[in-house]
Amino acid sequence: MRAILVNSEKNYIAYGNEQYQTKNTEGFDVAPHATIEVLIKSKGTESHGSTLYLWRYPCFECAKAIVYAGIRKVVYKHEDNSDPTRSEAQLLLEHSDIEIVKNPDLDF
């Protein structure tokens, strides 16, 4: 999965790529989702008012991070119907006045 963060002037801020198969010594998956990786890389200083481009609709944990970071718009390519937190994520984003746009033609 991928994520790209751009500011209100459409300037690139950060890119994130979800890492798979990253486990700690106890076998737990410790890889952050692409959304979280983007926010870590942006250091939180440039995310307010920005747009986040995602490969798939964000999970609830990523939605919380999106709201906290002050991101104003989320553009995504694919639905993730297997995510049990999808409806909670949608409610949180909608109630936080974040614009959500599905763009199946998104290419990155």
Where are these regions (language model features)?
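Zinc-dependent deaminase catalytic domain
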Residues: 1-108
